[in-house]
């Protein structure tokens, strides 16, 4: 089947188009929907297979990144969202979307239920907005979005991306293989919570996590902004090296596109 993706929009979300494009390149159908149309009943979550919370600055990050948008969902759509989760479908959140999902409590542990917040995404330790490329490695997690991915090169753009949770939660995440991505160097060596490899001071270098089923993932980096090789900062150098070696640079950064392909393939097992 061709899954349909509900790409959330409204109130400062600004990555809808490139996120929809990523899913389309992976073979999905997409529908960019304003949150008010869901609240008004013009569109229904149940009509989709994947819900996507894109990046941006919802409500200008007032009251904390992702908090106001999460409250709007809690107050109007949370029952629909829980039904969507219980039906076995997928949810993905990138950057501000990860922040929204964190505030909603969507990253349930084996010991918790949906709606219970287990972690936070706090201000970067250097108190600066970080906008550049980083490397992250996949931690052999249970996440359905990341099968076949090891290390990938991907951009970040955030001021509040420092993952934090208490020790008990961290060890439960680790034991259940819910820590999906960690910041690293180009060879996959741990960032050891050191800048600049870890851009925000994230606890144990955590860049992305999933829920206890592996069907709900959030991450701070932006794979939807880095589908194409031409977008990499080193593209011109790589192009020249490839030319001299009579090689061709692949059109896509496959490890980033794979996230969206895995979501589509999940519904075609």
UniProtKB/Swiss-Prot annotation:
Its annotated pathway reads:
Purine metabolism; IMP biosynthesis via de novo pathway; 5-amino-1-(5-phospho-D-ribosyl)imidazole from N(2)-formyl-N(1)-(5-phospho-D-ribosyl)glycinamide: step 1/2
Signal peptide limits: none
* EC number(s) given by UniProt: 6.3.5.3, 3.5.1.2
One Pfam family name from the record?
Answer: GATase_5
Give the UniProt entry's GO cellular component terms: cytoplasm
Specify the superkingdom.
Archaea
Catalytic activity from the UniProt record: N(2)-formyl-N(1)-(5-phospho-beta-D-ribosyl)glycinamide + L-glutamine + ATP + H2O = 2-formamido-N(1)-(5-O-phospho-beta-D-ribosyl)acetamidine + L-glutamate + ADP + phosphate + H(+); L-glutamine + H2O = L-glutamate + NH4(+)
The function of this protein is: Part of the phosphoribosylformylglycinamidine synthase complex involved in the purines biosynthetic pathway. Catalyzes the ATP-dependent conversion of formylglycinamide ribonucleotide (FGAR) and glutamine to yield formylglycinamidine ribonucleotide (FGAM) and glutamate. The FGAM synthase complex is composed of three subunits. PurQ produces an ammonia molecule by converting glutamine to glutamate. PurL transfers the ammonia molecule to FGAR to form FGAM in an ATP-dependent manner.
Please list the residue ranges annotated as the Glutamine amidotransferase type-1 domain: 5-262
Q: Where does this polypeptide localize?
A: Cytoplasm
What is the protein's given name?
Phosphoribosylformylglycinamidine synthase subunit PurQ
HAMAP family attached here?
PurQ (MF_00421)
Which keywords fit this entry according to its UniProt record? ATP-binding, Cytoplasm, Glutamine amidotransferase, Hydrolase, Ligase, Nucleotide-binding, Purine biosynthesis
